[in-house]
């Protein structure tokens, strides 16, 4: 039996790895897309159903090449998790136009371009799940988020527009707002810290969204630790 396919864009030792592990545990073939592939290769050695694809989400041709390879290797895509992000920090006096644009290219344009790669087949099947990973900055700007907050806010607006367009076609577009710090599963330094989110628990939320019944779809889910002040 052919496995359903989940593409995770943006792989690291926190959320990206947890998304991959969770969907793999549920029987999915996993495509790991990231600009640098060293960590992804180590993760793929751990997950039997995973394959690694180099992909710079700021380069349209790189996205087209990566997704063509995924389709050739695994088939059409059932779930897309867009976890790529750019932590460009600084105040407005410090940041360059390149810094500002690059943050938008990674957080928003990349999400736009990879979504275009999966929508046609999802429309044809009348089913599919696209999940964007947002942040506190998706909702409000703070000092030193001059580039990051506008990029995350525009990503959220993109997700809203896509959801309103695509839900009637059977494609569930959703957004997870991560409102807090995330611990690294590759380090024991903050394992017991109650004020950090466990990426495995965030991955549980992502999987839940991908399986929601159509009569009760969620668009935006914000997650934070119980100790977080909000």
What are these regions (language model features)?
Residues 55-65, 97:
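The beta1-alpha1 cofactor-binding region of Rossmann-like NAD(H)/NADP(H)-dependent oxidoreductases
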Residues 168-177, 183, 189-230:
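C-terminal helical subdomain
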Residues 115, 151-152:
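Active-site helix of classical SDR
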Residues 91-92, 99-101:
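Substrate-binding pocket helix/loop in short-chain dehydrogenase/reductase
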Residues 12-14:
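Conserved glycine-rich cofactor-binding loop
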Residues 135:
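Residue(s) in the substrate-gating loop at a strand-loop-helix junction
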Residues 27-41:
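Conserved glycine-rich Rossmann-like NAD(P)H-binding loop of the short-chain dehydrogenase/reductase
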């Amino acid at each position: 039996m052919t496995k359903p396919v989940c593409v995770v864009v943006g792989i690291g030792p926190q959320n990206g790895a947890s998304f991959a592990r969770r969907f793999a545990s549920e029987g999915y073939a996993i495509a790991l897309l990231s600009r640098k592939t060293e960590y992804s290769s180590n993760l793929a050695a751990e997950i039997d159903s995973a394959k690694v694809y180099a992909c710079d989400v700021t380069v349209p041709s790189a996205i087209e090449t990566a997704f063509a390879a995924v389709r050739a290797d695994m088939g059409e895509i059932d779930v897309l998790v867009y976890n790529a992000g750019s932590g460009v920090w600084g105040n407005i006096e410090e940041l360059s136009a390149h810094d500002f644009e690059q943050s938008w290219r990674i957080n928003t344009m990349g999400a736009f371009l990879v979504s275009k790669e999966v929508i046609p087949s999802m429309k044809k099947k009348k089913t599919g799940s696209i999940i964007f990973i947002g942040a506190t900055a998706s909702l409000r700007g703070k000092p030193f988020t001059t580039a990051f907050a506008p990029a995350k806010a525009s990503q959220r607006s993109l997700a809203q527009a896509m959801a309103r367009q695509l839900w009637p076609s059977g494609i569930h577009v959703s957004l997870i707002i991560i409102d807090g710090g995330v611990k690294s599963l590759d380090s024991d330094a903050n394992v017991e810290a109650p004020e950090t989110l466990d990426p495995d628990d965030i991955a549980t939320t992502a999987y839940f969204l991908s399986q929601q019944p159509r009569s009760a779809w969620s668009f935006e889910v914000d997650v934070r630790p119980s100790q977080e002040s909000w």
